[in-house]
Amino acid sequence: MMKTLTRSILDLTRSSKNAVSIQCGRRFISSIKATNLDNALLVYGEIPNKSYLQVRGPDTIGFLNGLVTSKLLPTFVKKNLTTIEVSDEKNKKDTNNNESPEFNEKKGNWGIYNAESHNGPYLSRFGIYSAFLNGKGKLVTDSIIYPSPGVVNDQTEAKIKLYPEYLLEFDKDIIPRMLTSFESHKLHNKIKFEEVKNTKTWDFFISFPGLTQNDPNPWIDNVYVPLTYLKNAEASNEFAESFITSLFPKISNKILGFYIERRTETLLNNDGTAPQFFRIVTTEDVDNAFDAFNSEAFPFTFEKLEKDSSFFKQCKLQYGFLDGSDAIQPDSLMPLELNFDYFPNTVSNNKGCYVGQELTARTYSTGILRKRLIPIEFENLSEQAVKLLNECDKYPDIEVEVDPKNQEPEPLQSTAPSPFGNSPFGNASTKLRQRKKAAGTLISFDGKYGIALFRIEHFKNIYDTPTPSKFFLTIGQEKIDVTPQRPIWYNEWKSSQ
């Protein structure tokens, strides 16, 4: 499945005729043999619908820690579902006896705290994927939190020394709601926040198709693992500066934030050919960030392809990922239903109180979760069906196809006898047919790719049988075949059941 998913992503890129070969010289990834990397691929594009709120000041990280699902501070541990307590051993050791990062949360632009890794907590100047919930524990929006600016050097050093500063990424339409939320939660926190409008957002990925699935993926040993050893601001700044200036030396001072996609980490650990996705935020005067891409940072030849935002959305849908509030109806979904518990440092179960924490903590503690988000593909999606789905004001139901030969009679439910005798609305002994529960609901789609919230009870008949169940949805007079795809996290989830 993982090989198929990777191949599907790469096949999407082959529809472009504007491939440009780039010959690389100086090695940035020194452990890779160039002879195995004849067809490396850089795919990039601008993402137009993103906006940013800048938050800065000495109380910034404490303020954000009370609003997002990620653990941004090491100083609180949860004793049970309803209490928190200040840790006496803060900044000393984590629960696995690993050294904890050293930083002053109120002074200096030190980056962002990552609570979990194989080497314990660490500091980074790369953004993290997180979420904002409402008071009932439902998702308002996901977000990327970027330490800003991306690069620390002589030109930005004076700014860096003042206090923490972050850019928070949102879809444009939800910015007014987030500004209102920030204002209501500000209280006495020493922070300032405002919308930053003069920005551009870019997605790109780099893959090494010349490798085999069984080869080690270069991004693991050259980026993921080294990141987890960064325990102070100086080390994380040095790593970020080296990485960013190696890739984009001409515009490094115009990069306001840099995000390394970590939600695909399981895939990269199992597939040497899997692409690594990135997102960068630049100032608006950058016409094309990838004209400044430094091909000499790698020891092999690239194909360079430009794609639109729909392409990158489809890539994320194939992985089963959200990318902004435009994909959902806000206040309708729980973060664990969206598999945020399988993403690095996205949801913490031991950070203490934050908005929406009670339901999330209770769900995590009890393990009772009836639905999860999975990727799907449509088999026969017509233009009319696309139009109707885009106009739909609720999540369309997905039903399981039942073979008429094996179909069981629908169960009947008796109504309670009426104490008033016969009713003009029907006999008291009328039998009512129970409505079958939908197998799932369609959350978002683009082209033939989508994400759907499926009932967990169907997983066995989808993924663990030689003859998987068939599914469909009906919109208007259109019946659309729906094929569930295996999510990246499925094996880990299955082993935990």
Swiss-Prot record:
The lineage of its organism: Eukaryota, Fungi, Dikarya, Ascomycota, Saccharomycotina. It is found in: Mitochondrion matrix. One of its GO terms (biological process) is iron-sulfur cluster assembly. Residues 88-107, 404-428 are annotated as: Disordered. GO terms for molecular function: transferase activity. Residues 1-36 form a transit peptide. The keyword Mitochondrion applies. Its main location: mitochondrion. This is Iron-sulfur cluster assembly factor IBA57 homolog, mitochondrial.
